[in-house]
Curated annotation (Swiss-Prot):
This is Altered inheritance of mitochondria protein 24, mitochondrial. One of its GO terms (biological process) is inner mitochondrial membrane organization. Residues 1-29 form a transit peptide. Keywords: Mitochondrion, Transit peptide. Belongs to the AIM24 family. Pfam families: AIM24 (PF01987). GO terms for cellular component: mitochondrial inner membrane. The lineage of its organism: Eukaryota, Fungi, Dikarya, Ascomycota, Saccharomycotina. The gene is AIM24.
Length: 447
């Protein structure tokens, strides 16, 4: 018997569960990261009304920029007291000793300032000593193998002295020399910074007389007239000539202004305010400057100085004793006239110079264009003695002349005042620390 069992097919059902994870986080009012909690800088827009100093970049030549309120390029150069300088690698910069404010490098290399090397130099020491220029003002030389930037101040920190020069406010002006024009700097301590591998600085003697070229141009003939740059008050007889290619940072007292003179244009300037002037070589300064004095009344400088010389025809004398007497007499007369004219001219010059000195016009010079002129608004020629600080401590004498000891009260406190009426004395004011004891004493007296 064959049993055939037909089994039911076994079917298993598996439940598939699809679970989707949902995370609900409450959004905080402000998300503050660790970086924000520890940051030490702010966005540039939060700092307003101030110039931003940008880090130096790849440079081929030095860049000088004055910081502050700058005026028009045709009238005023600047009124700033800070000079920002960006320097390329291997180009030295010379700064007046004590004027360096800051050194900072580029963003890509934060260690670029570590390669800056410094040294102290005294350029043109012997020439400055000969021409009466302060030769003890050294210059700090900075150079680096990577580009860097610096800030330079218009004031130089110097060693303290009893007599200190009253410098006052100073401002910067930036000169760019392209090799076509030279600059004659008459204020020898005004060069605060300079840079340029082909920049040349030299010292030359100030011309005492104008050139024949200028004398003929003004119609003076071959007569010599002074430039007015040298005087017995001013012991400096030299000036600094800047030539070549480079950048120079000059400082002046007060504000610095630029004047551009066209051809044959003339201007009168107090020589103490003249900072610099463009020249063509070291011997061109005598071709544009002449001393000027204000004439007295209706006197003209040209008329008084350029009077035509009358050439007399030679006289013939008879070869006898009377002719010799006439010849001697005429020679004596000519000598007397020359002496009288010299005395008159000398007295007129003294009178004119004295008048100009009293009214303050003795330092004026005339400059003839075409020239570029830099003038400073203030004059630095005064010295001040700093005030002596007084001690705030009060010294109390211990003993007086009558050998009575003066004791200083060491305790302080609050006291109550009261008044009593005493016979024969009237109102008597007294003080007491406690009213209770005083009231008891008054009660005992009344009993």
């Amino acid at each position: 018997m064959i049993n055939t069992k037909i089994g039911r097919p076994c079917v298993r059902l598996h439940q598939l569960n699809f679970i989707r994870s949902i995370t609900i986080n409450q959004q905080p009012s402000s998300t503050i990261s660790t970086e924000q909690l520890t940051k030490t800088t702010t966005i540039p827009s939060n700092i307003q009304q101030v110039e931003e100093l940008t880090n130096s970049r790849t440079l081929e030549a030095p860049e000088f920029k004055t910081l502050g309120n700058s005026g028009s390029s045709t009238t005023s150069s600047s009124s700033s007291s800070i000079l920002s300088i960006n320097l390329p690698p291997s180009v030295p910069i010379y700064l007046k000793r004590g004027s360096l404010l800051s050194i900072y490098g580029i963003k890509q290399d934060i260690t670029s300032i570590n390669s800056v090397r410094s040294s102290l130099e005294f350029p043109l020491f012997w020439k400055k000593l000969i021409y009466g220029i302060d030769s003890n003002k050294g210059y700090q030389r900075l150079i680096s193998t990577s580009p860097f930037s610096i800030l330079v101040s218009s004031q130089s920190r110097r060693g303290g002295s009893i007599f200190s020069k009253n410098n006052g406010d100073k401002s910067f002006v930036n000169l760019i020399l392209d090799g076509g024009t030279d600059w004659a700097i008459l204020k020898n301590d005004s060069i605060q910074a300079y840079s340029g591998n082909s920049l040349n600085l030299n010292i030359y003697k100030l011309p005492n007389y104008i050139s024949k070229k200028l004398s003929k141009k003004l119609g003076f003939g071959n007569k010599k007239f002074k430039t007015g740059l040298i005087s017995w008050i001013n012991r400096k007889i030299g000036y600094i000539l800047i030539s070549g290619r480079g950048n120079v940072g000059l400082i002046g007292n007060g504000n610095i202004y630029n004047l551009n003179l066209i051809k044959n244009e003339e201007i009168l300037i107090n020589k103490e305010n003249l900072l610099g002037i463009t020249v063509n070589g070291p011997y061109d300064l005598q071709n544009c400057i002449i001393k000027y004095q204000f004439p007295l009344k209706d006197q003209s400088i040209i008329d008084s100085n350029t009077s035509d010389v009358i050439i007399e025809k030679p006289k013939l004398y008879e070869p006898n004793s009377w002719g010799m007497i006439k010849y001697r007499f005429d020679q004596f007369n000519k000598s007397f006239k020359k002496i009288f004219q010299s005395i008159f001219k000398y007295s007129s010059d003294v009178k004119e110079s004295g008048f100009n000195y009293l009214v303050g016009n003795q330092e004026f010079i005339k400059i003839i264009g075409p020239r570029n002129i830099l003038i400073q608004s203030n004059v630095d020629n005064s010295f001040i003695i700093p005030s002596i600080k007084r001690s705030d401590k009060i010294v109390t004498p211990v003993k007086s002349n009558d050998n009575t000891e003066v004791k200083k009260s060491t305790t302080t406190g609050d006291y109550l005042n009261y008044v009593t009426i005493e016979p024969g004395k009237g109102a008597v004011f007294k003080s007491t620390p406690d009213f209770k004891d005083t009231v008891d004493q008054i009660d005992n007296k009344s009993k």
